[in-house]
Amino acid sequence: GKTTLLRTLLGLITQDRGEIVWLDDAGKYHNYRTFECLYQGHQLGIKNLLTVFENLNITKHAKGMSQEDIYKHLERVGLSNVNELASNISVGQRKRIAMAKWLLKEFKIYFIDEPFSALDDTATLLIEKLIKELNAKGCSFVITGHRPSGIEATRVEI
């Protein structure tokens, strides 16, 4: 249900009934594709045969970004083993690569499926901090999960 909801909101799955209406700040209708959004599902998009650095560097939002900036984003999420193959790192470290992708560009809306699963307390606190920082800059989050976190909704829409 939770993953299906996110995928339906993004148009990746067609709903059987009802409609999804996206409105901008002025109340004008838009297609979800007109909003700059990031979707992170269960599959993190991490390539096993690439290094930690290469996994971030190959994303479309890293194009034109200096290596130094990419290293800073990896460092910000606690990854210093940038030359390690992704096949040799833990699930938690793979999720940190995914978190670094959040930092490449400030998206209007982040759709994140189960960001807290398989993480230790340190990584959980890091995600909470990143979400709060990005939210303070005007970014919105739609998050699914099984376990509660230290993040409180600032606005709930039904």
Task: Tell me what each language-model feature is.
Residues 43, 48-64:
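Q-loop/switch helix immediately C-terminal to the Walker
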Residues 110-114:
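Catalytic Walker B motif of ABC-type/P-loop ATPase nucleotide-binding domains
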Residues 15-35:
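Conserved ABC transporter NBD signature motif
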Residues 85-94:
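Conserved ABC ATPase signature
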Residues 67-82:
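Conserved ABC ATPase "signature" region
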Residues 99:
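Hydrophobic anchor residue at the start of the ABC signature
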Residues 10:
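Helix-to-loop junction immediately C-terminal to a conserved catalytic motif
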